[in-house]
A protein has these predicted regions:
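Extended ligand-binding regions for polar small-molecule ligands
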Residues: 30, 63-75, 133-154, 225-237
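C-terminal motif of bacterial Sec signal peptides marking the signal peptidase cleavage site
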Residues: 25-28
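Bacterial lipoprotein signal-peptidase II cleavage site
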Residues: 30-36
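Ligand-binding cleft/hinge of the Venus flytrap
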Residues: 54-58, 69-78, 154-176, 205-209
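A ligand-binding cleft/hinge motif common to bilobed small-molecule-binding domains
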Residues: 89-92, 105-114, 158-162, 185-220
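Periplasmic-binding protein-like
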Residues: 46-48, 123-130, 206-237
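N-terminal secretory signal peptides and thylakoid transit peptides that target proteins
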Residues: 2-18
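Extracytoplasmic small-molecule ligand-binding "clamshell" domains
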Residues: 36-105, 113, 175
Length: 237
């Protein structure tokens, strides 16, 4: 049996409106700071992904990737402007020039020929998390279970490809556009598990005082990089 997939899964309108408000704030704050610097701007496209990129209590873009990107481009004579994007449209946006690069806990594995890369600058584990009291202990226990993943993300690719022999063919995969929703779905018991970067899951647990359990065996250990358009010849990589 092939994996089943629902291309969208929605929670209530309040959750989605809150996520949309955060997206709008991230874009406007990043643009103002870059303009005030007086340097030529580089538009960095990402979605909100604590602890890599998010808004602090003052509404200013911050996080691991924000700090690295800001300093790296400053040394090259540019000011990084952080713009929140629809993650599903990331390739079209960078190829069209709407953004200069994709930077936000972005896995290089399997995408080496799709973009012009700088990196890897960090290693990350893609993992499955379940409720703390779940009977799921390994990937093989996912048979007949429902897993939420971010649409166009690496975990979605792994589950839908059917290429990993550790993963049962009867897993139902729900693809979510906004990754914050997948965390909420697990916390509310709407799904049996989620798959994402381990650091992001740990940050969500810390920020929201929830108790997930991360399976010991990772889906993937991957390098994180900065993706430019394939034909970008500016030497920014």
């Amino acid at each position: 049996m092939k994996h089943r997939i629902s291309r969208r899964a929605f929670l209530n309108g309040c959750t989605l409106l809150a996520a949309a408000a955060a997206v709008s704030s991230l874009t406007s704050c990043g643009e103002k700071e870059a303009k005030d610097s007086g340097l030529a701007q580089i538009v960095v496209g990402s979605d909100s992904y604590p602890p890599y990129i998010y808004l602090n209590n003052d509404g200013v873009p911050t996080g691991i990737d924000v700090e690295i990107a800001t300093e790296a481009f400053r040394r090259m004579g540019y000011a990084a402007r952080f713009e929140t994007i629809n993650w599903e449209q990331k390739t079209n946006l960078v190829e069209s020039g709407a953004i200069d690069c994709i930077w936000g806990c972005f896995s290089m594995d399997g995408r080496e020929e799709v973009y012009r890369w700088a990196g890897p600058y960090m290693v990350s584990r893609q993992v499955v998390a379940v409720d703390a009291d779940s009977s799921i202990r390994s990937l093989s226990d996912l048979a007949g279970k429902t897993i939420a993943v971010q649409s166009t993300g690496k975990p979605e690719e792994i589950f839908l490809s059917g290429s990993d022999p550790r993963i049962p063919q009867t897993v139902e995969v729900l693809s979510i556009e906004n990754r914050s929703v997948q965390y909420a779905m697990l916390a509310c018991g709407y799904v049996d598990g989620i798959a994402a970067h381990e650091t992001g899951i740990l940050q969500y647990m810390k920020d929201n005082a929830v108790d997930f359990r991360i399976l010991e065996e990772p889906l993937l250990v991957t390098g994180l990089g900065i993706a430019f358009a394939k034909n970008d010849s500016r030497g920014l990589d």
